[in-house]
């Protein structure tokens, strides 16, 4: 019997006049095209995967001092152990190994160092109000990681087996999960090509590893503090047919120059635009939502579609599903241009704008610097009722204040 049920996000989206994304059903078809799946036994490639039952555990002799949850800097502290699994085209997957946290030793010609043959994921473990440790929708992260592996020509693996190994890693380092409802344990699975050759080719060697980091707020200005955005069409994050809808390091390293310019202009994050119409796509490391009154006079929660340009975020999907469940306003995946936003602001039709992501959960937007003009977004003045409600709902689920099928409890 499979450890996790498959994601069943097949909600019908409203057919918006400005164009909608491929449905979740189509996304399932994409997965089926790269993986033959059997509900009882996992993928057909399972015989070529590593197995959690073969996991080797080597415990650290000396344990590190754990940081104070109230003073955590995002991604700066790491737990005592890590998970590593090696792969070669000749022998397939080696046994997974949990070992003391250590530096990696790879060949200077490793393909990850020269050609960015790499992908990663990001999810969290939360210590609930009942002291139980929960993961939030980890099946979606594993599914996305497998999808990225296909795009990167890295070997496939059974996502359920990886999740089982990750759970054992967290179990071993469970005291690193902060005793706090404002902090969590960030989980970073990473998959790299380590082909020791300067040839540009599919790697014959790869390394999958997972590290853990106790974290507080992602933004230095604190949890649920509004951010300012810098929008400049001279920079493009992704394009159709590219890799922008995959969780790959190359998408983030190439964004740093724009992020530096945003900071120089007094803004927290980059608002990425696309095409001649300057369509809104993503915000830095977040998906973007606009809560407004649309041109038809309807109260609407809108977000850019999954058209190959933006990352299919887990938090994004969860917010769409919550909106559909509440049924209090229209929920739509649609293209939104800067002209659409500017016009709506002039006509006082914008209620809130906010970003979403694993790191921040929900982050309100206060302003956008665009073409030398600061556009004021009235998120905070309007009471940020929807973004606050979404934030409360998701964190209540994550910290166990509300029972939900979206969480996976550690035994």
Curated annotation (Swiss-Prot):
Compartments, record wording: Cytoplasm
The entry's keywords: Amino-acid biosynthesis, Aminotransferase, Branched-chain amino acid biosynthesis, Cytoplasm, Lipid metabolism, Pyridoxal phosphate, Transferase
NCBIfam families: ilvE_II, PRK13357.1
Cofactor: pyridoxal 5'-phosphate
Posttranslational mods: The N-terminus is blocked.
GO cellular component, one term: cytoplasm
One Gene Ontology biological process: L-leucine biosynthetic process
Subunit (UniProt): Homodimer.
Listed name of the protein: Branched-chain-amino-acid aminotransferase, cytosolic
Positions bearing N6-(pyridoxal phosphate)lysine: 247
PANTHER family xrefs: BRANCHED-CHAIN-AMINO-ACID AMINOTRANSFERASE, CYTOSOLIC, SUBGROUP IIII AMINOTRANSFERASE
Protein family (similarity comment): Belongs to the class-IV pyridoxal-phosphate-dependent aminotransferase family.
InterPro entries documented for this protein: Aminotrans_IV, Aminotrans_IV_CS, Aminotransferase-like, B_amino_transII, BCAT-like_C, BCAT-like_N, BCAT_family
Species name: Rattus norvegicus
